[in-house]
Structure formats: structure tokens, C-alpha cells
Amino acid sequence: MELSIATPQGAKGTVSVSEAAFGREFNQDLVHQAVVAFMAGARQGTKAQKNRAAVSGGGKKPWRQKGTGRARAGTIRSPLWRSGGVTFAAEPRDHSQKLNKKMYRAAIRCILSELARQERLVVVEEFDLDAPKTKDLVQKLAQFDLADVLIIGEDVSENLYLAARNLHKVDVRDVNGLDPVSLIRFDKVVVTVAALKKLEEVLV
């Protein structure tokens, strides 16, 4: 399978990639499962409240059962009392979902294959900046007619990372930092030839 290498002047040459990695049929259910699992794993789940067992206060009965004229009370930590525990207290929860590595890699292959079919995968020889300037990055992207884009490199340089940090429609990742949500979030995905070859090794 051949992918065109883009330059500011237009397509220039091609690069051979594996059909197994970039020519897969799109599996919507698998991609959906991978996206849901990734987003669930990103949830903090750190909510917490104190129930009647966790709030401070003694276990002593506040007053005797009968003869006072007041309502019966067994503890000052009752949810009915001020400063008592919460009736159905929220507890910390792990929202993560298990997804096999084989399925996860297959989902990434499906997304990359669909991007290639839709001509949203832009292959370049290299993509770097001489200085960490956002203006330079915007100008470089404009040469390729790109604005809403994910840039994938074999190793992300600090200059490129710092320049892209101030653009909310641009993100930079290395091959190991890829996830399904980032791949489907942007209009175009720019990948260097070196990163493409490394991706092929990881996915096949």
C-alpha cells in the first residue's frame, strides 16, 4: 500500500506501508468500545462523602430512650442530625474498563486506515521548528493548508511541543502517546515518515 508524501508544493513521492496496519476495514463497534474505555479511564472518580460510620462523634446514646418527651435518638452521627453523616454517601470509584491490548491496537489500526481512506492522514518527511514560536508553527501549518490538526512524530521536539501548546486546535504526540480519542478529534493527522514506520512496527 502506498501513501503520498506531502510537501508545501504538493505531493512528492510515496511511502510503502503495510496493508494490515493502514488498509483495515472500519469496525465502528470496536472503535466505539476503545473510545469509551479510554475516556472512562481518564475519569478521576475521587468524589467522597462521609456516612454515619465515618463522621466524628461518639457512639454514646444522647439521652435515655423513654421519659424525656423528646424523639428517640441512638447516636449524634445520625443523618437526621446536624453534622451527622450523609445518608447515601458517595464513595471513591474506579471507572476504568478493561480492554485487551489486541483490541486496542486493532481499534488504532481501524482509525488510521479510515483516516487514510478519507485522505485525512498527511504524511511528511519531517516536521520540526527552529524555535519554540507559535507564529512559526501557524505559518508552517498554513503551507500545508492545515489548521485543526494532530501532529505525530517519532520523538516530539521541545520546540514543537511548546509552540503547539498555545493552539487549542493543534496537538502534538509521539507514537507511544497515541490514543483513539486524539486520532478522531482533529480534522487532519500529520505523521512523519519515521513515525509512520514506527507505528507500523507497533501495530502489525
UniProtKB/Swiss-Prot annotation:
GO biological process: translation
Gene3D superfamilies xref list: 3.40.1370.10
Native species: Saccharophagus degradans (strain 2-40 / ATCC 43961 / DSM 17024)
Subunit and interaction comment: Part of the 50S ribosomal subunit.
InterPro entries the UniProt entry points to: Ribosomal_uL4, Ribosomal_uL4-like, Ribosomal_uL4_dom_sf
NCBIfam families: rplD_bact
Any one GO cellular component localisation term in the record: ribonucleoprotein complex
Function: One of the primary rRNA binding proteins, this protein initially binds near the 5'-end of the 23S rRNA. It is important during the early stages of 50S assembly. It makes multiple contacts with different domains of the 23S rRNA in the assembled 50S subunit and ribosome.
Annotated protein name in UniProt: Large ribosomal subunit protein uL4
Keyword tags: Ribonucleoprotein, Ribosomal protein, RNA-binding, rRNA-binding
Domain of life, source organism: Bacteria
Region (Disordered): 49-72
Family (UniProt): Belongs to the universal ribosomal protein uL4 family.
GO molecular function terms attached to this record: rRNA binding; structural constituent of ribosome
